[in-house]
């Protein structure tokens, strides 16, 4: 009899945990991507440049308050270096950085390199004898991009991607 009571208590506890998870999933407004096939190691992702209170959604439009920042639009090409995030034909919303404080680890930036605009992720922020610089890398590239990205080279910071 004692064993049966213990088993029933354990089953009740487990059922309560499962029911709590289901209720949380049903009533939560946050979406949480699940990663069940590969490591849950944290990877760099973009800084939250736009806060929830800066976004207004109505039936037929989305408004984003950029706090006076200068806005740009971009259409990406398919180089495969940022596949999974950016691909051929995707549209990006970008703002022009005003200071180095606008640029964060994980941000996707467009920078000038050999007369081209390259769009890669910031993986390092450093200082040397010439001052501040960023290290960039395409998400699917093995090595970081050659050279240092000085502030003058970084033209845009991506804050939204429209698929």
Predicted regions: what is each one?
Residues 1-163:
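Extended hydrophobic leader/signal-anchor segments used for secretion and membrane insertion
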């Amino acid at each position: 009899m004692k064993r049966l009571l213990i088993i029933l208590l354990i089953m009740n506890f487990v059922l309560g945990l499962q029911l709590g998870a289901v209720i949380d999933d049903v009533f939560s407004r946050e979406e949480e991507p699940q990663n069940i096939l590969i490591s849950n190691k944290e990877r760099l992702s973009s800084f939250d440049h736009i806060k929830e209170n800066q976004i207004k959604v109505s039936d037929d439009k989305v408004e984003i308050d950029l706090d006076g920042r200068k806005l740009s639009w971009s259409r990406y090409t398919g180089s495969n270096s940022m596949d999974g995030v950016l691909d051929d034909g995707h549209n990006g919303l970008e703002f022009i950085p005003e200071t180095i404080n606008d640029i964060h680890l994980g941000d996707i930036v467009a920078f000038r390199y050999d007369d081209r605009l390259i769009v890669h992720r910031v993986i390092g922020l450093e200082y040397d004898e010439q001052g501040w610089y960023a290290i960039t890398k395409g998400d699917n590239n093995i090595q970081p991009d050659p050279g240092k990205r000085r502030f003058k080279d970084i033209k845009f910071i991506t804050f939204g991607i429209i698929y």
